[in-house]
Amino acid sequence: MPEITLTVNHKAGLHARPAATFVQTCNRYKSNIRVKHGDKDVNAKSILSVLTLGANQGAVITISAEGEDAEQALSDLTKLIDGNFGEGG
């Protein structure tokens, strides 16, 4: 299963609007997508699950995807996170 490790640089971390944007992006794909921070590994397509990660600014997260569009999903999620969720935060 391909995976990527990224640092969340957005000032709000993976919370509120950034989390919603992240989950919306994940839901565009058929692949099973998981996100891990610390000892928590959750369904990346669930806003409540993503919020429970507590991934603040500077958090290192690992995203894995399994399915026919896994590579594209990981590529787009990398762009989203590296681009501060389109908010410039």
Language-model segments: residues:
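Hydrophobic alpha-helical segments and their boundary regions
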Residues: P2, N43, Q72-A73
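Intrinsic-disorder/low-complexity, polar/charged segments enriched in Ser/Thr/Lys/Arg/Asp/Glu/Gln
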Residues: M1-T5, V60-T62
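C-terminal structural segments of small proteins and small subunits
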Residues: N56-G89
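Compact, glycine-rich, soluble single-domain proteins
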Residues: T7-L48, T52-G58
